[in-house]
């Protein structure tokens, strides 16, 4: 027998087996043939494996979306991964925002309150960006990779053996059908022999599949450890971000902030929440409005007729002819006037004079 004859016979045998399985499967669907049912334990294991696969895929994909919301970036990373190449490093959103803030602060002037605050905010955003990058790397290594290994490795093996078990089951039921239809003694003997062989192969494949499926419990235990690692990575990330923002808030405590709810303003002048070396902790918020009490240096000025030099913290446009417009960083002369509202001083610049809000000023020694 030459190799070609052997290949032809093998091809014919394979075709016959495939046809036999197709016929058996079709007859089962039509209710014209009996089907060997798997034992309940094996069915439960198969169901558990399928459930694990479905939810692992969903969790894995949504975690990827959480860590990298940009779909184009995810596709790029996927392509590089398939090419077994490292994806080029890309700046993330917090880092980009931080760089914009730093550039803006530098252009506005690091010596100005707003420029200095922008630079500090930008540096914090870049630190958050670094923490974000570390979270992605740690989560990908300790959480996503094990999940992906299960989907692309263990479960593929399970699916392959499950498919093989299905084929062995079809072979077994086809052999049972042929035995039932056999009439001649010789045909019956041959069919019985075939049935014993297919039964043995089916039992063997069922055992192999069962052993693989029982490993799902170990998979769950492993994924639980990976989940703990992911939670720890998130905890570290959020703790870092909280600390960064806490430090930033403390640094910005010496800068003016123009935020006051429009609904709570009692005059046309915006009132900053805190001022460097001027308001400090004496600014307290109450329900419905922001109450500011003067620190000692301003109180002394109001209680006397003396004049002081003051540096303007940021620009102010006069609302009417009784007020004096201000430019950030300019130095003016200020003094109190009896009967004037406690939030205002009289400002003087050359021959110009008018009311100025005290919250826009830093008194100089």
From Swiss-Prot:
InterPro entries according to UniProt: AH/BAR_dom_sf (IPR027267), BAR_dom (IPR004148), Endophilin_SH3RF (IPR050384), SH3-like_dom_sf (IPR036028), SH3_domain (IPR001452), SH3GLB1_BAR (IPR035695), SH3GLB_SH3 (IPR028503)
Pfam hit, one: BAR
Compartmental location: Cytoplasm; Golgi apparatus membrane; Mitochondrion outer membrane; Cytoplasmic vesicle, Autophagosome membrane
Residue numbers carrying N-acetylmethionine: 1
Residue ranges annotated for the BAR domain, each copy included: 27-261
Gene Ontology biological process: 'de novo' post-translational protein folding; apoptotic process; autophagic cell death; cellular response to amino acid starvation; cellular response to glucose starvation; membrane fission; membrane organization; phosphatidic acid biosynthetic process
Stretches assigned to the SH3 domain: 305-365
Coiled coil: 156-185
Gene Ontology cellular component annotations, sorted alphabetically: autophagosome membrane; cytoplasm; early endosome; Golgi membrane; membrane; midbody; mitochondrial outer membrane; neuronal cell body
Keywords carried by this UniProt record: Acetylation, Apoptosis, Coiled coil, Cytoplasm, Cytoplasmic vesicle, Golgi apparatus, Lipid-binding, Membrane, Mitochondrion, Mitochondrion outer membrane, Phosphoprotein, SH3 domain
Gene3D superfamilies: Arfaptin homology (AH) domain/BAR domain, SH3 Domains
Phosphothreonine PTM positions: 145
Post-translational modification remark: Phosphorylated at Thr-145 by CDK5; this phosphorylation is required for autophagy induction in starved neurons and facilitates homodimerization.
Region spans: Required for membrane binding: 1-37
Membrane-related topology note: Peripheral membrane protein
Entry's free-text remark on domains: An N-terminal amphipathic helix, the BAR domain and a second amphipathic helix inserted into helix 1 of the BAR domain (N-BAR domain) induce membrane curvature and bind curved membranes.
Protein family according to the UniProt entry: Belongs to the endophilin family.
Protein name, UniProt field: Endophilin-B1
